[in-house]
């Protein structure tokens, strides 16, 4: 089934997404390590919601900054030097 093959292919590489809030830019930038935009936005939303519960999923801008990061970083977020993966993405923060 072609769709299944595409889904598997889609999940081969973990990417780093630079995420920010359109409505609350003062919240700054979060790097989310995920397979796709949807997961990245959800991760970033979780971080932003700790500071401002009004941040909405649809209000999060995400763009790929790195296309192939170690799989161990999947589902993690990074926004300061204490986080895993910081050395990979510090230039984007």
Predicted regions and their residues:
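Small side chains
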Residues: 16-19, 32, 44
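Compositionally biased, intrinsically disordered low-complexity regions
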Residues: 10, 36-37
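A short, exposed loop/beta-hairpin motif centered on an aromatic-Gly-Thr core
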Residues: 26-35
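Short aromatic-glycine-(Arg/Gly/Cys) micro-motifs in beta-strand/loop hairpins
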Residues: 5-27
